[in-house]
Regions:
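An aromatic- and glycine-enriched ligand-binding surface/loop that stacks and positions planar moieties
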Residues: 1-39, 117, 140, 144, ...
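A broadly tuned preference for mixed-charge, low-complexity surface segments
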Residues: 56-57, 124, 156-157, 228-235
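Conserved, well-structured interaction surfaces
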Residues: 3-14, 36-111, 134-141, 147-161
Length: 235
């Protein structure tokens, strides 16, 4: 179930994925939808800053945050009942899942705000996951608590490159702090990553000699990479 939680990082449609082409590139003015006016016409409202609550791009972005987080919650609860897991494996997987849950919820917060989404963790029973649950509470502290647990529990280098590392968790914390506008708190974390961070393969982080290497399948997980996951075709 831990591996299953990673499925939340990829979605079957392109408009709600984590690379945020819609809510980052198009909304930010760096990209245009193109094509014909009746092709994904709801994207026009995003591009013209006229999004309403009926826009299904928003609905899917909302669902994706909880789709991913719930997979983490299910895995965490199953692990609590597992009798044949050693402490090291349990600690590592728990840290992985909390990293992923923080990432999923942060993706939602970037769109809906820190008081626009209820924080649902593994302690909340399924019958309590009602869409009417109070969502007026700032969930940044919850997200940051997950990130801190990930920083504490993740290793510097994983045995499998797609799993998050301590460097990845630190980078996520810095991104969250910057999203909150706390550049002063993020700066020393980023400086530490630059000086001591490791790539998924355990290399010292550094800029690639050729920028294209970051987007080339033959050089994936390179020295400029902090966290990336490869999926099978159709996954």
């Amino acid at each position: 179930m831990v591996v299953n939680a990673y499925a939340g990082l990829t979605r079957p449609t392109g408009y709600d994925n984590m690379f945020n082409w819609v809510f980052g590139g198009v909304y930010g003015g760096d990209a245009n939808k193109g094509s014909e006016s009746n092709d994904q016409s709801v994207l026009n409202s995003v591009e013209t800053y006229a999004v309403t609550a009926t826009n299904d791009y928003l609905l899917n972005k909302w669902k994706d945050a909880y789709y991913g987080a719930q997979r983490c919650n299910l895995a965490l609860n199953v692990m609590k009942e597992a009798a044949d897991m050693d402490e090291t494996t349990t600690a590592n997987w728990t840290a992985e899942l909390k990293f992923l849950r923080a990432l999923f919820m942060f993706e939602g917060v970037k769109i809906f705000g820190p008081t626009g989404m209820p924080y649902i963790d593994e302690t909340i029973a399924a019958e309590e996951n009602d869409p009417k649950v109070h969502n007026g509470t700032d969930i940044y502290p919850n997200i940051l608590a997950d990130v801190e647990a990930a920083i504490e529990g993740l290793p510097e280098k994983q045995t499998e490159v797609a799993r998050p590392t301590k460097t990845a968790a630190k980078a996520l914390k810095a991104k969250i702090l910057m999203q909150q506008g706390d550049m002063a708190a993020a700066k020393p974390i980023l400086a530490d990553i630059i000086a001591n961070g490791l790539s998924p393969k355990g290399e010292r982080l550094a800029l690639q000699d050729d920028l294209d290497a970051n987007f080339n399948a033959t050089t994936e997980n390179g020295k400029e990479s902090i966290f990336e996951v490869q999926f099978s075709v159709g996954a």
